[in-house]
UniProtKB/Swiss-Prot annotation:
PROSITE patterns given in the database record: NDPK, NDPK_LIKE
Classification via NCBIfam families: PRK00668.1 (NF001908)
Protein name as catalogued: Nucleoside diphosphate kinase
GO CC list: cytoplasm
Protein's organism: Mycolicibacterium paratuberculosis (strain ATCC BAA-968 / K-10)
Reaction equation(s) it catalyzes: a 2'-deoxyribonucleoside 5'-diphosphate + ATP = a 2'-deoxyribonucleoside 5'-triphosphate + ADP; a ribonucleoside 5'-diphosphate + ATP = a ribonucleoside 5'-triphosphate + ADP
Keyword set, alphabetical order: ATP-binding, Cytoplasm, Kinase, Magnesium, Metal-binding, Nucleotide metabolism, Nucleotide-binding, Phosphoprotein, Transferase
Length: 136
């Protein structure tokens, strides 16, 4: 089943010049980039994107990090795109859970600075794509 997912290359991935490597892995997996944009994230967009974490102790640091530098936002499409990208990304803890061969396993340094975000469900993908690409 063809799906769409939101992929973010977070500020640490942009700063470490891993954008080309990450996009290359997405394309080699057979997924298609249907929208791509480099942007600075506003506090408002960050708060909406991470709304499910509001009230948690790490919420403020999430917002601070995602707004700390440019982010590459992309809509990625393909068969089972959500699961396919999450497999490419690897576990959220790059040291303990992300295996070598995944983006986080190969390049991640710590849990908060884990390079990429990918939607975790069809519902999340629709909501997140609507936030980041309202005209899509």
């Amino acid at each position: 089943m063809t799906e769409r997912t939101l992929v973010l290359i977070k500020p640490d991935g942009v700063q470490r010049q891993l954008v080309g490597e990450i996009i290359g892995r997405i394309e080699r997996k057979g997924l298609t980039l249907v929208a791509l944009e480099l942007r600075h994230v506003s506090q408002d967009l960050a708060a909406q994107h991470y709304a499910e974490h509001e009230g948690k102790p790490f919420f403020a640091s999430l917002l601070e990090f995602i707004t700390s530098g440019p982010v590459v936002a992309a809509i990625v499409e393909g068969p089972r795109a959500i699961a396919a990208f999450r497999q490419l990304a690897g576990g959220t803890d790059p040291v303990e859970k992300a295996i070598p061969g995944t983006i986080r396993g190969d390049f991640g340094l710590e849990t908060q600075f884990n390079l990429v975000h990918g939607s975790d469900s069809v519902e999340s993908a629709k909501r997140e794509i609507g936030l980041w690409f309202p005209d899509a």
